[in-house]
């Protein structure tokens, strides 16, 4: 029981980190494009 809850928490944290990574990548690309213009 406890372990499945822990797994769920870890999975949701991993999801958040993935989402943040994606957003940061897009943001960096956008700022790079901004510099080039």
Swiss-Prot record:
GO terms for molecular function: toxin activity. It is found in: Secreted. GO terms for biological process: defense response to bacterium; symbiont-mediated hemolysis of host erythrocyte. Transmembrane segments: none annotated. InterPro entries: Antimicrobial_3. Expressed by the venom gland. It holds the Pfam family Antimicrobial_3. Signal peptide: none annotated. Its main location: secreted. The keyword Ribosomal protein does not apply. Keywords: Antibiotic, Antimicrobial, Cytolysis, Hemolysis, Secreted, Toxin. One of its GO terms (cellular component) is extracellular region. Disrupts biological membranes, particularly those rich in phosphocholine. Has antimicrobial activity against Gram-negative bacterium E.coli, Gram-positive bacteria B.subtilis and S.aureus, and hemolytic activity against sheep, pig and guinea pig red blood cells. Has insecticidal activity against S.frugiperda ovarian cells by opening non-selective ion channels. Enhances the insecticidal activity of spider venom neurotoxic peptides. Belongs to the cationic peptide 02 (oxyopinin-2) family. This is M-oxotoxin-Ot2a.
């Amino acid at each position: 029981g406890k372990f499945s809850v822990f797994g769920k928490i870890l999975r949701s944290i991993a999801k958040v980190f993935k989402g943040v990574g994606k957003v940061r990548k897009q943001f960096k690309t956008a700022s790079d494009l901004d510099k080039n213009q």
